[in-house]
Amino acid sequence: MRKLIHIGTLRYDNFQSVLLLLRWRLRLRNGVYVSLENSFECQLEDEQLAVQDGLQLLEYAPQQRPLLDEVHEGLVGRVKSLPAKLHYDQRGSMLFEEICELDEYYITRIELALMREISDAIGEAVGKRCMLIEPGSGASLKTDLLLAAMPDPAAYVPVDISRDFLLESAAAIADRHDIEVLPVWADFTKEHPVPSCEAAVRSRAIYFPGSTVGNFNRSDAASLLRTFGSMIKDQPDDGCAVMPGKVVVGFDCKKETGRMEAAYNDKEGVTAEFNYNVIDRLADELSVALDRNMFSFRADWVEEEGAIVSRLWVQETHSVEMAGDVITFEAGEAIRMEESHKYTPDEFELLANESNLALEKLWTDDAGDFAVACLQPLSA
């Protein structure tokens, strides 16, 4: 039986404008075929095909502002900031996996223990022949537990902005589970098409673990949840869906300040390196003459925001040229790097309702440190 790899680069202004369907099959070495679908502009490289053997990789690359423009805008503002997505290149994604193993980072341990207890209940909630979509995916034990608990899952769709990390994690899941794996290379914060799979799909479920929802401010978190709700309400192409879709999302609960801050200021400095890596990327990829040694990292609880805010603090006044401007970094000012919002269960239910989602079920650990919510569209 021949292997089929789907590789598509779809460029669009909006999904409704995509009117052209291009199908092109190209015979490659070792009996492997490539199918280019839903493409205005298609690009192939031999080295890409080698690592994708046996997987279907779907690439959705919407027209976006140049990254340099985004960085420039963040650094000329009254409060300097950088896009949080800059953390997640291949090295950044690997560093985040290391963070999840740290002693101080309680979130992963507590969530994993909770998932061991509730995975069967989640599997029952999403039902048979469900397509599981995981934005910002990783080859984690949490995902393994859920896939193992799901009755006859139809497919697994990991979505990630880091292409190399996506392929590695997708291959790991494919090795461990007898399920069709359809990796999607995309920015999961932007709406994108859901791939079709070979099996009949009765429903879709989005799995968003690890308190990643907390990395968005309240407005952006609501927008993201609305996007998820739209994705699970859409009918699969075969029209077989008979169950309402679900959004299964984890969030970190509010707790003692010192404990929350320690989770983001680890003694080994992995979280600091996670942030310094962004400075290195700007220097290497955008030729912005920033030096990591001119900054120090610190994460603090900001009560009025209900969030841990991670910042790089300027150690010495210095200036750099960027996009025709000279940007000055004053000693003592900070670059806002990332935020990690915490919620009480009631606060999160209110956020879900504002996103047109209803809370169907909520699970927490015994101490109430971490929660997993099962949501469904309010209209379902």
Where are these regions (language model features)?
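N-terminal auxiliary segments of SAM/dcSAM-dependent transferases
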Residues: 31-85
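Class I SAM-dependent methyltransferase Rossmann-like catalytic core
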Residues: 83-84, 96-121
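Conserved SAM-binding loop of SAM-dependent methyltransferases across substrates and taxa
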Residues: 139-151
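Class I SAM-dependent methyltransferase SAM/SAH-binding core
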Residues: 154-190
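A short, conserved alpha-helix within the catalytic core of class I
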Residues: 216-227
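Conserved beta-strand signature within the Rossmann-like core of class I S-adenosyl-L-methionine
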Residues: 235-252
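Substrate-binding/catalytic lobe of Class I Rossmann-like enzymes that use SAM or dcSAM, i.e.
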Residues: 261-341, 353-354
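C-terminal lobe and adjacent flexible extensions of AdoMet/dcAdoMet transferase-like proteins
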Residues: 321-380
